[in-house]
Design a protein with these regions (language model features):
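Hydrophobic/small/kink-forming positions within alpha-helical transmembrane segments
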Residues: 13-18, 45, 66, 70-74, ...
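Hydrophobic alpha-helical transmembrane segments in multi-pass integral membrane proteins
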Residues: 44-54, 100-115, 155-170, 218-235, ...
Length: 283
């Protein structure tokens, strides 16, 4: 992984944590994710007007990925409804890197070398440490339905990361791929919200429109950067490096949601930094 690719993934991590924090801050999660999905749909539709059309070989991956992204959004919405940001976000993000490493090795034939493997393992240990501290440090008993939803979110992340890693390479155009992905995945949650809220939906969305659309723009930018990176580096290190967003999420939780950071999170963040350094050793 080159420094430029690593920088792109780190920017994506910051952007991703930011849009997740915006989503969590809107208390009605159905409204929050309707705005983010619907905003992504509008942005993606605009991008299709000038982005190259993805190659035919990419479309099976686009369709599967869109379904996985919808599942991811629904599970993330449920985990944010049931649990605290400082617990749910690291569990969801921390599950993905090791699963992606296995999936990429089995289905894509990308077997990481020793440095990358060590980096993924150490970074993932840091992520798991942050997640466990979120459970134990909160002073609350674990809320298992929320944790299961967060784990399911992580599995969905691993699934679409692997699918998109193959699909974007087959597409010939990362920009066109992300544009059509946003269009395909952006229909489901707004349709579900309309089914649930009917005529009241527009009035309920209006107070949160600016924040929600900002979250949508950040979401598209974050994943576009990741897709570009996946055309230039193996999937597993990108997945692990992307999850440095948990450090940003912990900082956001401390500053804006008044959650404690503490020594355990600092130690876990240190493991993340070591893991990132090991992954970059291969560049």
């Amino acid at each position: 992984m080159t420094p430029l690719v690593a920088l792109a993934v780190l920017i994506a991590a910051i952007t991703h944590a930011s849009w997740n924090a915006i989503a969590h801050a809107i208390k009605d999660q159905l409204l929050s994710f309707t705005l983010i999905s619907g905003g992504g749909l509008l942005i993606g539709a605009a991008m299709t007007l000038f982005a190259p059309f993805p190659a035919a070989a990419a479309w099976p991956y686009l369709l599967v990925s869109a379904a996985l992204h919808v599942a991811y959004m629904m599970l993330l919405m449920r985990s944010f409804t049931l649990g605290d940001f400082g617990q749910m976000y690291p569990i969801a993000r921390g599950t993905a890197p090791l699963v992606v490493t296995v999936l990429a090795a089995v289905f894509v034939g990308e077997r990481p070398d020793g440095w990358a493997t060590a980096g993924v393992a150490v970074a993932s240990a840091g992520l798991v440490g942050l997640a466990l501290w979120g459970i134990r440090g909160s002073g609350k008993r674990p809320h298992w339905p929320a944790i299961v939803a967060a784990l399911g979110t992580g599995l969905a992340i691993a699934g679409y990361t692997t699918v998109d890693g193959v699909g974007v390479r087959a597409s010939g155009t990362p920009l066109g791929y992300v544009a059509w992905l946003m269009v395909l995945e952006g229909l489901a949650i707004p349709a579900y919200a309309y089914y649930r809220r009917r005529a009241e939906l527009v009035a309920q969305l209006r107070p949160f429109a600016v924040r929600g659309l900002l979250g949508a723009a950040l979401s598209v930018a974050a994943y576009g950067l990741v897709l570009w990176a996946q055309t230039r580096a193996p999937l597993a290190p990108i997945a692990a490096l992307r999850e440095s967003s948990i450090i940003v999420g912990a900082a956001i939780g401390t500053l804006f949601f008044k959650e404690r950071f503490g020594a355990p999170r600092i130690a876990a963040a240190g493991l993340m930094v070591v893991g990132i350094g090991l992954m970059l050793h291969t560049s």
